[in-house]
Amino acid sequence: TENGTIGCHKTAGGHRKFTMQNVRDYYKVNKKASKSDEIALENFEHKKIYELIKKNNFSELAHKLANASIESDESTVKTIISGSYMNNIDVETLFDKIVDPGSMIVEKALHENYLSHTEAFISRKIITRASESLNDNKPNGSYNGKSALCVNFEDNLPDLGVVMSEVILRHKGYNVYNTGSHAELGDLKKVIDNKKIDLIVFYLCNMQCCMSVVGDNITKTADMVASIYETASKLKVEVIFGGLGIELLPDISKTIKKTFIT
């Protein structure tokens, strides 16, 4: 607002546009406001989730996230993710302690035949959509210093890992371009030049619904990584490889030095 209470963006027509980031920043400065039960209960679906968030009970939140996604309860999934974000849990902690563990609980249910492949995919898609909404608070723009390309492999169906990478990079000040699933990168040099890419992030999971790590596809995936890395190296673009799928590509770690598991 104009008196500086909560930051906002004013449009040419004079309208004020707020994002979750604006409100989040306000709560950072005004601790008493963030502790108000009235405000919390207005923004979060019920008191139990609010209490878990305030106590940083990440394990319980991860289980609630998994259960809500399995039940296709999108409202609760959004409440857990957006509520944690609004209470100033940084995105790295949110993903490492709540979202990724919640997704792995869904994967375990699939392994134990509690869920079908379709049900697990629906569940993870709900979590992915809620996570991706955090990008709205950090849009791409000329004010960002660097640009990153997040690469999901052609046969890799779940987008959650690459979406989490995108959210974190945006919060680090990057413009981020996400290829999504089944993307054909085509002339990578042209993409890097046109978008002025400084960093490429690969993400490969090893879940049952990920076809990039099945049979002959694992060789195809390894060849694709090697090809992209070679092109990026020639153009002096930094490369990071993430996800549990890296354990299935042992030669990659010898080539790409910067890696992460989750």
Q: Whereabouts are the PLM-identified features?
A:
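Glycine-centered, phosphate/nucleic-acid-interacting loop/turn motifs that mediate DNA/RNA or nucleotide
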Residues: G4
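Long amphipathic alpha-helical segments
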Residues: G7-H9, G13-P139
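Polyanion-binding surface elements
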Residues: T1
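C-terminal regulatory/effector modules of DNA-binding transcriptional regulators
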Residues: N113-S116, I122, I126-T262
